[in-house]
Amino acid sequence: MRFLRGFVFSLAFTLYKVTATAEIGSEINVENEAPPDGLSWEEWHMDHEHQLKDYTPETFFALHDIKKKGFLDENDILSLYGLNREEIVGAGDGMGQHDESEKIDNEMAKRVVSLIMRLLDVDDNTKITKEEYLQFAKRGNKFPDLGVGVGHHSDFELEYEIHHWNKFHKDKDPDVKVVHKEDIEHELLHHEHEIEHEEEIQRGASRATVITDDELESRIELKNIPEKFKNGIF
């Protein structure tokens, strides 16, 4: 994943960024997702994941203080950046091809937490209090793009519901009379993921085992795919 792509809060912070980048290293896999032009990572995250184009620092903090503790801890930061899981299935949002799936690099996740703590945890107690964050935001700062994508909070099934099902089917078309390509893409991803994990159990394979899309699709039982998702395609 591309790491530390571009967050410049000030000339001094630019110097800090260079140091941090060197410390992190270059062994991280490349992540292709990037904020749209004109948006910071934080703004991109809030728009894409929370459907909020306008928000206050108080709203941002409340949404990401998961247990309403009054501070952000390691788990909150991992959740914010979509790293609170063992693997990212497909593109992470319920879409994509199964070959795109990847395991979360635990060392990288630790470095993400460490960097964010160094930026915001003023008293160095491994907690980012609401006041610490509000002071950070008051200076015009925002959570930086660390090259790990938009920060999907949930697994690929729930992300599909959030970004597609709730928008197009939940109220308007609960019986899926209108099938979109996203519905079929997600259904295939779901079946491929199930097959891979069944194979891991049967073979005693490690989590690093990779099965190609062609192999997975050849084993999908079309009769198990609900008719509402076929729409004459299969």
From Swiss-Prot:
Recorded hits in PROSITE patterns, A to Z, give: EF_HAND_2
Organism domain of life = Eukaryota
Q: Which cysteines are joined by disulfide bonds?
A: none
Give me the Gene Ontology terms describing cellular component.
Answer: cytoplasm; endoplasmic reticulum-Golgi intermediate compartment; fungal-type vacuole
Q: Phosphoprotein: present as a keyword of the record? A: yes
Supply the PANTHER family for this chain: NUCLEOBINDIN, NUCLEOBINDIN 1
Misc = Present with 6900 molecules/cell in log phase SD medium.
Q: What is this protein called?
A: Protein SSP120
Organism equals Saccharomyces cerevisiae (strain ATCC 204508 / S288c)
Gene of this entry = SSP120
